Amino acid sequence: RPNADSMYPSKLYPMSPYVVGQSGRPAQYDPVALIVRLAHERSLSIHAWINPMRGMTEEEIQLVEGEYPIRQWYDDPQLRGRYIVSVDGRWYLNPAYDEVVDLICAGAEEALRLYDFDGLHMDDYFYPTTDPSFDADAYASYQASGGALELAEFRRKALDDLVYQLHEMTGKSRVGRIFGISPGGNVDRVFHTQYADVYLWCGVDGYIDYICPQVYFGLEHGSYDFVKVCRTYQDMIQTDSVDLIIGMTFGKAFSGEDPWTSGRAARTFWCGA
């Protein structure tokens, strides 16, 4: 689910342009069924991958059929700007609302029900902005009802609740399925500007089964060198129920180039060549 769409025929999300070429077109085949089958034939584990919050562009959403919640929210002047919010020309889902969280979880449950996935994976597109206007109405309602959290903590709590529900749903869908998240390597940005509380998720039971930080920085990066970032995430883990999996970039392994690892060391580091 790259942009509030679907790589398979879904009752909840429109087909992704990555499959059909343009928003609003029907599916001609099911690539997810094919990928899952081919992966398992090769003894590979495969997880359903979602971007829960990131949606589509203004141009794309206007092509979506009215049967889907994302288009219904766009067409409703009371919900557009609340359930879905435009940031720099792209629409994002706002997890401050139960209805939005319900859609995200239902979409993930649908994928796990329809296909023989081994787990669920949540990518790193969390809050797209620090601007208070993103969820101003939801936050004002929260304060009016007696809520005392600062905006940053309000947003982290919204993400915490979403992550908790996704983890719980994944575990209930089938014994042995796991749920994990791949935050960025810049932990300060992840926590302070994207409002993802990776410390909580890694520190206690019930949120994730694994953390897979995107450690795309080479050994010579001035602030976020590979070893430093790996150790930062390793130190976060305070429970035996969470595993650390290092997310590495296939792009640099393919190209053999990395501005933060010099010379032949780049190719050797990323792909062992």
Regions found by a protein language model. Name each.
Residues 39, 104, 111, 120-123, ...:
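Conserved, mostly hydrophobic/aromatic
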Residues 1-6, 113-119, 204-211, 272-273:
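Catalytic domains of carbohydrate-active enzymes, especially glycoside hydrolases
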Residues 12-29, 86-105, 147-158, 213-220, ...:
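The substrate-binding groove and active-site-proximal loops of carbohydrate-active enzymes
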Residues 6-22, 54-87, 124-147:
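Aromatic- and acidic-residue-enriched segments that line the glycan-binding/catalytic groove
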Residues 2-51, 146-173:
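Aromatic-lined substrate-binding rim segments of carbohydrate-active enzymes
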Residues 25, 30-37, 47-48, 53-114:
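Active-site-adjacent "subsite" loops/lids of carbohydrate-active enzymes
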Residues 98-113, 189-206, 226, 258-272:
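Short, acidic/polar
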Residues 131-258:
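Glycoside hydrolase catalytic-domain groove-lining segments
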